[in-house]
Amino acid sequence: MIVYFDTSAFLKLVIAEPGSVVAVRAWTDADQVAACRLLYPEARAGLAQARRMGRLPARFAGASRRTLEALWADVEVVEITLHVGQAAGDAAEQHGLRGYDAVHLASAVHASADALVCADTDLLRAALACGLAVVDARS
């Protein structure tokens, strides 16, 4: 089974928070994990923000980054091609998604994902509308 992770779910693999158990289970059960190229800079930014906000103590920052890098190495990366970009534009218009969420949805469809794991209500709704199974990592 191909499971697509958006950044909100991927970060739950690195930082223990509500939804982490669900995200870890989805990762473990997947035959293949896919994500778009944008996930990496988004995840790095998310780690930095967690550090600034005090959700990630400074003493764990290095280990968290190493965990992120190790997980990223196991991801089948979906590149943002012209086709994916255009599909993302369509998804943004059709489903009222923000730009990056639309890219994640288009990338999941492009990867022929069986399920999308995320913690964003609008993206979960749009994925269901596109016929994808979803794993709700909000809690």
Q: What do these predicted ranges mean?
A:
Residues 1, 30-33, 74-76, 110-115:
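Short active-site oxyanion
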Residues 1-39, 50, 54-63, 130-132, ...:
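Short, well-structured N-terminal submotif of metal-dependent ribonuclease cores
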Residues 9-10, 39, 84, 104, ...:
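Alpha-helix capping/helix-boundary segments
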Residues 25, 58-60, 67-70, 80, ...:
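Anionic, Ser/Thr-rich low-complexity intrinsically disordered regions
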Residues 34-35, 79, 99, 118:
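Short beta-strand scaffold positions
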Residues 39, 63-94:
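Acidic catalytic patch
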